[in-house]
Structures are given as structure tokens and as C-alpha cells.
Swiss-Prot record:
GO terms for molecular function: structural constituent of ribosome. The gene is rpsB. InterPro entries: Ribosomal_uS2 (IPR001865), Ribosomal_uS2_bac/mit/plastid (IPR005706), Ribosomal_uS2_CS (IPR018130), Ribosomal_uS2_flav_dom_sf (IPR023591). It holds the Pfam family Ribosomal_S2. This is Small ribosomal subunit protein uS2. It comes from Geobacillus sp. (strain WCH70). Belongs to the universal ribosomal protein uS2 family. The lineage of its organism: Bacteria, Bacillati, Bacillota, Bacilli, Bacillales.
Amino acid sequence: MSVISMKQLLEAGVHFGHQTRRWNPKMKKYIFTERNGIYIIDLQKTVKKMEEAYNFVKELAANGGKILFVGTKKQAQESVKEEAERCGMFYVNQRWLGGTLTNFATIQKRIKRLKEIEKMAEDGTFDVLPKKEVIRIKKEQERLEKFLGGIKEMKELPDALFVIDPRKERIAVAEARKLNIPIIGIVDTNCDPDEIDYVIPANDDAIRAVKLLTSKIADAVLEAKQGEEAVVAAE
């Protein structure tokens, strides 16, 4: 049985690509037809590619691998946070800070600062500081939490990236490629699939489509974790 059905994909509008004038010819093999100036994605290929991505993620997670979910466009922000948290993985859903992967040590310093501020809030340091200073530090905390909250516990580079719209997240994709980190991507008809190791051809603009596919990636992680728990229980 496939991990996702044609019916689910159709209902979520996964088949709607971009306007025909905004396309990348490299996506031609994933296009079924054209309707009213819009490309229609071949959902049979989406089912097959989703299966490949699902199995890759499941295997990676079963071996203790960590995945970073990346989606900073409005339609993806909520799903990325919810699904990454649901399966216990990391996420970036605001702005991708340049160097998040390629300058990991600097990002870790910012995370350390965020944790220091959190500790100050807990241990009563705020109570003895001047009010103005507390307000300034809290603003800094808010900013750091906004951009780094989803990778706060990421102690080392992730083993894979799951990206919604590689065109929008081109900096993240370039950094992962530089470091040979595999990339799974929801790739619409206007994107370059060559940059992505596991291409899921799909509509990357509809909230329902993004939610459905992101939830399947999270399901793959959870299935792997349940497998681990079953093995531990059997021992």
C-alpha cells in the first residue's frame, strides 16, 4: 500500500502547478498536462516520489538521523513548525539565517546566548536588573527565539534537509549542497529539481498541499521511532 493516495493528493490540490509562463523546463517529466494556462503535475509520479522520500526518511530516522524542516513562506510556516515538533525534529520557519549550516559555530553562539537569557529569566536575575535592561534583554530573547527556536536543541549539523520550495529556500539548499547534506524537497513546476536529492513534485503554494506532504514526512520519522520502541520493548 502506498504511503499517500491519489485521492488525498487531489483533495489537497497537490496537482496544481504554476502558470505555464513561470516554469522550469527541467520539471517537464513531472508535468501531466496544461489546463487554463496552469501546469498540472503528474500525481502518479508524486505518489512514487513520495514513497521514495518516505522510505529514505524512515531509514534515516531509524538510524538516529536528524532532519531539519525548512519552510519560511507564509503557506508553510505553521505546518513546518507543527509537523517538526510532532515528530521531534528541528525546523526553520521564519527567515533562513545565512550560515545556519555553513557557519554552524556562529549560530551555536547565538543559541548559547538565547539559553543564557532563558536561564536569567528562570533564576531571578531579571528581578535584580534595571527595568530598562530587562526590556532590552527580553526583546533580544524574542528575536533569537523567533529565528532560532526551532534549532535550539540542534547540537550538530542535521543528516538531511526537508525543504518546501527550494527556489524560495535557495540559500538553505546551497548550504546543504556545499556540505553534502541530502535534501528532500517539495518541488513545484517553477523549481530546479537537479538541486534536490529526493524530489516530491507538488504544489508548494497551497496550505493544504504543504500540510499533507509535510505530515507524511513527519509520519515517516514517527514510524521509524515506533519501530525502535518496539525493538526496545522486545528486548
